[in-house]
């Protein structure tokens, strides 16, 4: 079954309002084994909406439309669908009843302008809106079934779940396909390299698809399939997951789609370990990432942004002589920072960073992009020194934070 999504409204078209509805609908359809081919958006124009509906119905089995069902003059979707289907608008008893019930339950008066929402294309099947005034509807146009829903996200989600998807599942009948997918997360490789290593995917795994998404500095690889039975779909997704791990290598750190901070948290919980962080160049970003994970209070104990040298001395016990001799950005300094924060917090691990995020502050010996990472644990302190610059302060800070988290992750393996 092929589906398309049509969003209507000037505010959506102009970007004033983000179309979160399309993303939600696509995810629900994907889980039901339905292939979403296109997302389309048109403004509040009767002719444009009608033309889009006609065009989409010629190539899709199912069309899901959002927006334009309200009582105002710019709510044109119902009339546009009627025009595309060459149907007249008629008062639908079910739509009228659901609207009257809605107003009575809320002790409100139904205005004349509201009655417009009970006018549906002739032959349409009303889909009751349990939490709003505007009913939705389903209308067959040739081989395509059109489902029209409100644009208000919570109303759309409710209608999609209770009124639209059950009808679509009935339309699928015995021809339903079952979807399965897995998401793998990668750190430490550029997108181009990941793409090269995925080159043989289609030949090795017929019937599987993959997509690559970047959220710097992580890369997410989603493998997916649709099959006549759920067991086959799940088995193929598992095989694809193993293929990706083999081809991409140890840079794949999660096959559950976890971000690096979440994977580190999972490993800390598994090891019954705790962590404390001392940050200089990352400015609290590591702590923010770790505490953004639900349940992080089980393993995250303390964070100190010891940006100034004196703070490193006063809070963490770093020797002034170490800083004077080697500099704040040095493996010697982060060694003492990591050891100090571990001691102060009483944590299993102490993680520390010091570096030069830029755009200024670099030298020939320590250019912008230089970061030193220290990790103190029960078996001592390890340090590392890396120089990787994106000539962008925010990107450098984020990369530094992920390099530190990756150091901890590998220690926990």
UniProtKB/Swiss-Prot annotation:
Q: Which domain of life is it from?
A: Bacteria
| Homology family | Belongs to the CinA family.
NCBIfam families (UniProt xref)? cinA_nterm (TIGR00200), molyb_syn (TIGR00177), PncC_domain (TIGR00199), PRK00549.1 (NF001813)
UniProt-listed HAMAP family: CinA_B
**Which InterPro entries does the record associate with it?**
CinA (IPR050101), CinA-like_C (IPR036653), CinA_C (IPR008136), CinA_KH (IPR041424), Competence-induced_CinA (IPR008135), MoaB/Mog-like_dom_sf (IPR036425), MoaB/Mog_dom (IPR001453)
Under what name is this protein listed?
CinA-like protein
Q: Which Pfam families match?
A: CinA, CinA_KH, MoCF_biosynth
Taxonomy of the source species: Bacteria, Pseudomonadati, Thermodesulfobacteriota, Desulfobacteria, Desulfobacterales
**What organism is listed for this UniProt entry?**
Desulfosudis oleivorans (strain DSM 6200 / JCM 39069 / Hxd3) (Desulfococcus oleovorans)
């Amino acid at each position: 079954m092929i589906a398309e999504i049509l969003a209507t409204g000037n505010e959506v078209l102009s970007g004033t309002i983000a179309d979160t509805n399309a993303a939600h609908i696509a995810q629900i359809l994907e889980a039901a084994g339905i292939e979403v081919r296109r997302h389309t958006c048109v403004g509040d124009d009767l002719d444009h909406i009608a033309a889009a509906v006609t065009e989409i119905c010629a190539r899709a089995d199912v069309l899901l439309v959002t927006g334009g069902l309200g009582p105002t003059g710019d709510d044109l979707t119902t009339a546009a669908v009627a025009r595309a289907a060459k149907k007249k608008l008629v008062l639908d008893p079910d739509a009228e009843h659901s609207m009257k019930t809605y107003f009575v339950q809320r002790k409100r008066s139904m205005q004349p302008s509201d009655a417009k929402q009970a006018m549906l294309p002739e032959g349409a099947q009303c889909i009751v809106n349990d939490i709003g005034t505007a009913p939705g509807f389903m209308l067959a146009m040739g081989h395509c079934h059109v489902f029209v829903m409100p644009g208000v996200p919570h109303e759309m989600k409710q209608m999609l779940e209770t009124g639209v998807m059950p009808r679509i599942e009935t339309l699928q009948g015995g021809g339903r396909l079952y979807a399965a997918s897995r998401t793998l997360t990668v750190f430490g490789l550029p997108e181009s390299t990941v793409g090269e290593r995925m080159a043989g995917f289609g030949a090795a795994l017929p019937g599987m698809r993959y997509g690559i998404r970047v959220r710097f500095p992580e890369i997410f690889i989603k493998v997916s399939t649709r099959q006549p039975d759920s067991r086959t779909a799940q088995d193929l997704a598992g095989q694809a997951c193993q293929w990706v791990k083999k081809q991409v290598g140890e840079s794949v750190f999660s096959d559950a789609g976890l971000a690096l901070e979440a994977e580190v948290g999972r490993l800390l919980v598994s090891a019954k370990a705790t962590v404390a962080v001392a940050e200089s160049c990352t400015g609290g970003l590591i702590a923010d990432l770790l505490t953004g994970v639900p349940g992080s209070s089980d393993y995250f104990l303390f964070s100190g942004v010891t940006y100034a040298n004196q703070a490193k001395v006063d809070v963490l016990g770093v020797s002034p002589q170490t800083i004077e001799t080697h500099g704040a950005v040095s493996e010697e300094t982060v060694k003492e920072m990591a050891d100090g924060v571990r001691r102060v917090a009483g944590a299993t691990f102490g993680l520390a960073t010091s570096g030069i995020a830029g755009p200024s502050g670099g030298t020939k010996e320590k250019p912008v992009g230089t970061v030193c990472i220290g990790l103190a644990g029960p078996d001592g302190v390890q340090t590392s020194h890396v120089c990787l610059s994106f000539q962008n302060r925010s990107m450098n800070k984020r990369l530094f934070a992920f390099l530190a988290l990756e150091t901890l992750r590998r220690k926990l393996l």
